[in-house]
């Protein structure tokens, strides 16, 4: 098959080399965007008198037929035509004849592919934002059910202080809110049209870039044609934002994996989000959580891969940029699916409230309460810290907890300690009293929930 760019060449290409250079196997994901961009481009060519109205109408009709065929899965792409752009142009030629060759007037594949990617990512980010908003709604709803559910709070994966389970959920709500803000803020750098930049220097034809941008729904155009065809910052930013988002999902998944274990038993995932073992009949594995945790690494890899591709590229277009698409496509699919799976896990998981609270009775996470109690009685906090630390050691040696220490022993430690100490040491009291702004106290959780609902 003759190449559309073959005029300068005498020798024929070889199939195995064509296969290496072709991108149609993956960039066909942008067929819809490529047709959309071409429709806007031909409309602009007609408006500006670069082609006749009749020619514009004929090309437009052909492109719309191809849109219908694409929707029906009837377009067949060929590696011989390299990429989605040449495939569509070749198919258009088959549809309407030689006039199809006028479509590429005042356009290069360089600005064409950049336009496709902006269109694709703009819609993909909108879809991800929608799913992220749904996840935030799920978290708020779940937190609303568990304001007074007590669980251990951890540092170093050791029991630290008791907290409300809602407080834990709302911590992730805060993380996902920042993810949402980053994605929404990035849209303005995606929503820019490079169409009309041509190969790198613009074109001699009297085009109207603002018109084609308006037809495509872009809010701005690139001010510099070199920048327009070579910019991939918007993809890097998306990959970076996605990496942070996946990191947040992965952290929560790590906790779910721990919490579903026999050692914790804090939560139970439904069968839909679990799998079994081919040899161990009793197993119920949190595979979906593990997969999200694992897929986080591939999103990181896509980010680093893209940065590495770009780090040594001179302006403007280089074939290296063919490597900018697969990581983007993969990240879009991974993030979108991970968000939907994760929201389903959280929405349907069973919370074992009694086990959560019981676990706070078999630890020393109330030690800070005793230290604070002494400090409020006038004991310098560092001295109180020392006293309680020694008492914890004593308790561990005797196999008891702070709430089991006899009152007589508390009196020996410090006569300022009164019988209300046992109420102070209860997990519920410990949580209730932490009512500083942003704290885990029930009143503060209700404030946080109200604020979260307002932000949905």
UniProtKB/Swiss-Prot annotation:
The family database entries (Gene3D superfamilies) matched by this protein are listed as:
Fumarase/aspartase (C-terminal domain), Fumarase/aspartase (Central domain), Fumarase/aspartase (N-terminal domain)
Question: Which reactions fall under this protein's catalytic activity?
Answer: 2-(N(omega)-L-arginino)succinate = fumarate + L-arginine
- Would the keyword Amino-acid biosynthesis turn up in this protein's UniProt record? yes
Q: Name the GO cellular-component terms.
A: cytosol
From what superkingdom does this record's organism come?
Answer: Bacteria
Report which residue ranges the record marks as coiled coil.
none
Q: In which pathway does it act?
A: Amino-acid biosynthesis; L-arginine biosynthesis; L-arginine from L-ornithine and carbamoyl phosphate: step 3/3
The record's section on SUPFAM superfamilies has:
L-aspartase-like
Gene Ontology molecular function: argininosuccinate lyase activity
Q: Which InterPro entries match?
A: Arg_succ_lyase_C, Argininosuccinate_lyase, Fumarase/histidase_N, Fumarate_lyase_CS, Fumarate_lyase_fam, Fumarate_lyase_N, L-Aspartase-like
Q: Which UniProt keywords apply?
A: Amino-acid biosynthesis, Arginine biosynthesis, Cytoplasm, Lyase
Q: Name one Pfam family in it.
A: ASL_C2
Where in the cell does this protein reside? Cytoplasm
EC numbers listed for it are 4.3.2.1
- Keyword check for Lipoprotein, yes or no: no
The processes (GO biological process) annotated in the record are: arginine biosynthetic process via ornithine; L-arginine biosynthetic process
| Sequence similarity | Belongs to the lyase 1 family. Argininosuccinate lyase subfamily.
Q: Write down the PANTHER family for this protein, in alphabetical order.
A: ARGININOSUCCINATE LYASE (PTHR43814:SF1)
HAMAP family membership: Arg_succ_lyase
Q: What is this protein called?
A: Argininosuccinate lyase
